[in-house]
Amino acid sequence: CNKLAILNRGKIDQEYPLFLLYNKANIPGRPESIGVHTKNLSNRLINNQSKKKYNLVLKSLLKGCQLLKKSKCKFIVVPCNTAHYWYEDLKKKIRLPIINMPKEVFNHTLKKCKKNSSIGLLATEGTLKTGVYNKFFDKKYNLIYPNYILQNKSVNKAIKLVKMGDVKAANKIIKPA
């Protein structure tokens, strides 16, 4: 919230953006629910346990989206990249625009980088596992990823530091990646 207010400074209160924040910290683990819903299996879920995990996360995300819709929001932004694994199912069930963050990053990249360029993707292991960026980037760019050591020593630690609000320390740790 602070960052949103800082980036959209107003001279008076009425100039600040109106937004609603729904933060559900106890949502079931997204990374543990990934890999259970693949196109390779004709969109069939692998087994009942995997289906339950997938549906628990979907149900939790839907609850948040429905609450925002009831609050008369005009669109929804999901800041968790990994949660975009459930984007298509959310979109089908919520009659409200949901900003697709990986697609927006791709559109921005199209404006800034030549096609067929190598683009580094620094993300959580869950986001990498979902392939939510690959479906946009694979045909136009060469996505490159940190190796296992850099992922664990730099990227994962930097992401945790950002979540804790220590961006300065995260900037130092991410440099090797």
For the regions a protein language model found, what residue spans apply to each?
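Non-catalytic structural scaffold of enzyme domains
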Residues: 1-177
